[in-house]
Amino acid sequence: MHSSSILGFVSAFVASASATGVLLPLYVYPSAVYNDGATNWKPVFDAVSAHPSVPWSVVVDPHNGPGLSGLPGDNDANYISGVSQLNAYSNVKTIGYVRTNYATSSMDELKKNITQWHDWSTYTGADIAVDGIFFDESTDNFSYLNEAITFARATFGSNPITTICNFGATAPAEYYSICDIVIAFESCLNCVGAPQYQSQTTISANIPSGYEPLAAVIVHDFTGAAYDGSIADASLLATYLNTLKSDNVGWAYFCSAGYDSITTGPATVGQVAQDLA
C-alpha cells in the first residue's frame, strides 16, 4: 500500500472537503503496444496531473477481477506499468474490480478475488497495491454484501481501504453504513429503455438526503440529446457537473462513449476533471 499517496490523498480531500471527485471505471487496456509505458492511460495521467486538487478513485479490471493468472499485476507488464504510474499520484486511489453478479457470485469466488487483489501489494518490482475494492453489480442483499466487505477490510488488515458498491440505482440508506461510496445512478444519458439522467431530479430521487458526499453518479454515452432536448455538448456537461458539485455529491464520471473510451468528446476524461476542478 502506498502510504505516502494515501496521506496525500487525504490531505487533498480535506483541503477541498466539498469537492466532487472523479470515479473512473478505467476499462481500457493500458497499452497500445507491449511495454509502451501504458500509453492508453496517458490521458488519465495527464488529467490527474493537471488537476491535483481533484480526488480520483480509479477502478482497474484486468478480467472481471484481478486477472486469470492469479499473480500480482496479472503477470502483465502493461498493467504493472499502468497501475504503478497511477499509484505515484497523491490524489489517486486505485481500486480493484470484483463482480458480485447481483449477489449470485459465490462468496468463495468473491473472497478469492479480494485476496488476489490484496496480494498485488506483495509485488516487489513496483508499487501496484490497490487501495480498495469495487463491488460491481451490487444489489439489495445486505448480509451478502456486508460479509464481502467485512472480509475485504479484514484481508487488507491495517491498510485502510475504500469500498465502492455499484448499485447503479437507488440503494437503501443502510448500505451507506458499510460502503464508503455508493453508486446511486449508472446509465446512459438518454437511451431507449434505460433510466434517463435528469440532473437534479435524478440526484434527489436516487440519493438519500444527507448521504450525498458518499454517493456517486456515472453517466455513459453522453451524446445526442438529453431528456429535455438539450444537446449533449461541453456546456451541458459543465452544467450537470456543476449541479453535482453544488449538491456536494462525492463522486461523478461522465463519458461520451462506453467505458472503453476516455478520449471521445465532449466528455473526455480531461474535460470531466477540468469541470470538477
Residue spans of the language-model regions?
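Fungal secretory targeting signals
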Residues: 1-19
